[in-house]
């Protein structure tokens, strides 16, 4: 599959703590590279419709950038593209040092070019590093999904999106667009954690050289499920001298997955940057967590669209 070719050191203009070590990058199938740890603008930073400009979201994002995060994962449906753009400007870090992700809403029909132009305007940017179809659920036919992907190919060819990809796609959705695609998706961002491992989907990605990004990786901690994974994470946290959250994120990274996390707490964000590069789980530990996770199925997002189809995965 894709391979880690380089490392990322937080730029001095962002004034990160001196002790922040390197974060790896992953080479995508289009030749571009993506930082493997992302700061997400969803969940805690999600803004409900009609809410005004939120300075707290700006401050949270600036904090993440100054801590050393360069991969910023945004989306139209998060409702905070203006705040993301403001944070980029306020951070003082040059645009070219940042990796900005945007997503078109995947649950409604809209003109792709108009939606993308609106996103760029809200963020005050000329381009994004990665543009994703947030979900396939807007499409009533294979042809509609294929046309949306053709729209994305045109945006990439225009230079306004360095890479293009999808999110929340199952193998069946990927097969539809690959049938007609001139440019394959660079990445598929999916909910991924020990309690939702998607069966053979990761192997399909490897065979087709499509990278995977994991969101909600800490579900065993953040959900109310009694997770057997927690016992393993607790034991490993003591072994490696890090938090359970670091173990959970490391489990994804050690499988070659780009990993999206978020927090409004600077200490937690800095801890991830400090500790994640310092440890590596053994193959046996990765496998042990995976097997424990399979004992319970938990999906936190898009339940009404996926269940019960993926309950066993």
Q: What residue ranges belong to the model's regions?
A:
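A structural motif
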Residues: 69, 125-128, 161, 185
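Acidic (Asp/Glu)-rich catalytic clusters
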Residues: 28-30, 65, 85-95, 117-126, ...
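Short, acidic/polar
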Residues: 47-65, 108-124, 145, 172-175, ...
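A short, structured active-site edge motif that brings together acidic residues
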Residues: 95-108, 130-136, 192
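Beta/alpha (TIM)-barrel catalytic core signal, keyed to glycine-rich beta->alpha loops juxtaposed to Asp/Glu
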Residues: 22, 135-313
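N-terminal binding-site loop/beta-alpha segment at the start of enzyme catalytic domains
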Residues: 1-97, 219
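Acidic-and-aromatic substrate-binding clefts and catalytic sites of carbohydrate-active enzymes
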Residues: 46-52, 73-83, 105-112, 138-142, ...
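CE4/NodB-like, metal-dependent polysaccharide N-deacetylase domain
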Residues: 113-133, 154-158
